[in-house]
Amino acid sequence: MKALDELTFDNRFARLGDAFSAHVLPEPIDNPRLVVASPAALALLDLDPAMADTQEFAELFGGHKLWADAEPRAMVYSGHQFGGYTPQLGDGRGLLLGEVYNAAGEHWDLHLKGAGQTPFSRMGDGRAVLRSSIREFLASEALHALNIPSSRAACVIGSDTPVWREKQERAAMVLRLAPSHIRFGHFEYFYYTKRPEQQKLLGEHVLAMHYPECLEQPEPYLAMFREIVERNAELIAKWQAYGFCHGVMNTDNMSILGITFDFGPFAFLDDFDANFICNHSDDQGRYSFSNQVPVGQWNLSTLAQALTPLISVEALRETLGLYLPLFQAHYLDLMRRRLGFTTAEDDDQMLLEQLLQLMQNSGVDYTLFFRRLGEESAEQAVARLRDDFVDIKGFDAWGERYVARVARDGATDQEQRRARMHAVNPLYILRNYLAQKAIDAAEQGDYSEVRRLHAVLSNPFEEQPGMESYAERPPEWGKHLEISCSS
């Protein structure tokens, strides 16, 4: 393990030049203190988690100090927001401190969110509030624990610095880790500003840093785009399988590595609702749960357009056509496992669609249904779960087909079935009301609940004694929390 002052930085993105980012120093927050830290994320930097409790740690990630070899940069990019193109966005409140290599040879971007104003703040104050910082921290680490690709969050640093949103709140900073912070919007920016040299330089950087295997292909940029399509298809399949609704799938929030990025008004489904809208600001439901699949393809098409100086239109169109089949294959594979199947049958998709429609009509808890489905034999589970459905006759008919399908699957050992299903069906997810309870306590200076919730969510598949309340259905008030883009 390293001491904090032993971290060494590389700044390869900064070396691309001022056309790509601006040099900005963090603006410190008043009286910085640790709210919560992720030992697993800190380990990616070879840091001892015990260091998080030191004042030096709070001052470093509260903007008061800086490593000598760090070169903080605010990145410039553009993007399509709710379907419309915005010519210039960029890091309006966050700074890329640089890259750190760990003992395993991995490189991790360190990005300090809430670090103050930048040239891209667009009239904003450059700050992040404690509320949104806690939500990003919890979501990042919860998704990782669910095996859903995501940026990581190493810590949240709180402060006494006042900021105004709908009311006065307090500023905080999040240390975000990711192999890259390059977004679809980076390529869009140089495409729409007609700067092909910078576009090519960015492409060369991404190939060398993140897709070196594509350099061996006859058409490296096309191979890179195919990888991006495949990764995003798999990512969104996992979102859909686990009921995660991102809320703001603008192209500036889409990662070229296919990881979940930029957490705002996200939510996990409580009751299954294919039309669920988690973003209170999304009046038209563009980013509803069911729309995430086509929006993912639409976003990839905007990236494809931006890559036309590097790749032929015909090749881009053909590669983009792989998205839906790839999504469907990944999604069905995940859902078969969630249903306890070890084999594939042609009618599995129909069986799944019938189940989801029954769940939608009855308001069945999405996470708990699948968890309970694996608690007992198929026959016993179906008999126990039927009372959750309004259309009992319809569920009974589905249950007969499901039990027959399980029998054909041939995996008869119940203990093995239980272990197999529990390994993919979480007991604990980040429900909005749990996050809100942790935020309410933290805003009063009590960080124990956010730390406890983080610990529970770090091990979502294993039953944790004494933590039964974290696996319950939400109270009625918890189902109707309005989350907006305000952060």
UniProtKB/Swiss-Prot annotation:
Keywords: ATP-binding, Magnesium, Manganese, Metal-binding, Nucleotide-binding, Nucleotidyltransferase, Transferase. It holds the Pfam family SelO. It is an enzyme of class 2 (transferase). The active site is at D252 (proton acceptor). Its EC number is 2.7.7.-, 2.7.7.108. Mg(2+) binds at N253, D262. Its cofactor is Mg(2+); Mn(2+). The keyword Metal-binding applies. One of its GO terms (molecular function) is AMPylase activity. ATP binds at G90, G92, R93, K113, D125, G126, R176, R183, D262. It catalyses: L-seryl-[protein] + ATP = 3-O-(5'-adenylyl)-L-seryl-[protein] + diphosphate; L-threonyl-[protein] + ATP = 3-O-(5'-adenylyl)-L-threonyl-[protein] + diphosphate; L-tyrosyl-[protein] + ATP = O-(5'-adenylyl)-L-tyrosyl-[protein] + diphosphate; L-histidyl-[protein] + UTP = N(tele)-(5'-uridylyl)-L-histidyl-[protein] + diphosphate. Nucleotidyltransferase involved in the post-translational modification of proteins. It can catalyze the addition of adenosine monophosphate (AMP) or uridine monophosphate (UMP) to a protein, resulting in modifications known as AMPylation and UMPylation. Belongs to the SELO family. HAMAP family: YdiU_SelO. This is Protein nucleotidyltransferase YdiU.
